[in-house]
Amino acid sequence: MSLHSPFGPNALLRRLSLLIVIVALMAGCHPDAGAALPNQAAAGKDEVDPVDQAALAQALNALQPQRPGVTDLYVVGFAGDASDDVFRNETLYLRQLFEQRFAARGRVVTLVNNPDNLGEQPYAPLATYDNLYDTLAAIGKRMDRKEDALLLFVTTHGTEDHTLYVQVDQNEEDFISPQDLRQALDDAGIGSRIIVLSACYSGGFIPALRSPDTLILTAARADRPSFGCGNTSNATYFGQAWLIDAMNRSDDPLAAFDMARTAITAREQQEGELPSLPQQSLGKRIAPVLARWRAGLQAGAAVAYPYPPLETAPDAGQDQDPEADPDSKSLDDPTKVKVPAAPASPRKPAPVPAPATP
């Protein structure tokens, strides 16, 4: 089932391309890519999911208005592929980090695809193009175009032809092009933009998204994969380096990117990976907005990453005594994971002949 409504005359082409994407993912960055996911039996073709729409309405109604004279940062996280927990992990951590360290509480929306976010009591709206479009539109109505800024963080698989892969469950799949993303941002009337894309080949989004009011940070060059997706990792290489490590050391997204690029280069060299070559594009008008935001910000303490490395995580079938540690919480609820004392780097995923779409 396609989630993406504004197909226009290219609907058939999108469907055919989607089949190619799915095949590529199944042969791509990790052995679990494209694994079967739960089927939402109640959701028919092109039907609106009332549970998801209620979750979206609740999230958007909770958004706080902008404050005159203050450069407010609105934050949107998008975990696109439900088959990999790393995308959910990073997106929920994005909320924790920006609410606690960067004083963005009331101005953060997370859209998440994961099997644990399906059902009658989701903890976040689903990560679909329509939900992203509506979220950006709602933020555009609340923010001051000349004063405030948006940070959009997307973490998912990317394709060689420069699309972002979206999978809610086995019947709901889509992909988002650079033009789709630009249209959603432009239609929302959002001025100052910080766009962070953690996906393979994400540098291919830069030409369509570039503007004087935009900072773009990508995990890879247009012709390169990035690494760390899969169910053997708790974070992608880029998510670990930029979001988890560098943004806890700096309040400057661009300075954090420079730190992350250095760390990723060293890690890829050490592990023998093809360099992903993260990219950035800085518009001439976005830098003063970032400077104003940072000047009015008193950054809080570093926020620990709450998802333990998988090599030390409890076995799925292992029984645990809940009274052994009264402060521990079930890993089944990603919003209530016990924060480890010192989060470590994710384990390198199993090598594959040609990683194509992490």
Where are each of the predicted segments found?
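Bacterial N-terminal signal peptides
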Residues: 16-28
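Active-site-proximal C-terminal subdomain of hydrolase catalytic domains
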Residues: 199-284
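Boundary/activation segment at the start of structured domains
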Residues: 12-15, 29-148, 233, 292-323, ...
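A short, glycine/acidic-enriched catalytic loop
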Residues: 156-187
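Loop/turn elements at helix/coil->beta-strand transitions in domains of secreted/extracellular proteins
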Residues: 71-74, 104-108, 145-150, 188-193, ...
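Bacterial N-terminal signal peptides that target proteins for export
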Residues: 3-17
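Extracytoplasmic/secreted proteins, especially bacterial periplasmic and envelope-associated proteins
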Residues: 58, 89-93, 97, 127, ...
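Solvent-exposed loop/turn segments at secondary-structure junctions
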Residues: 81-84, 113-118, 156-162, 170, ...
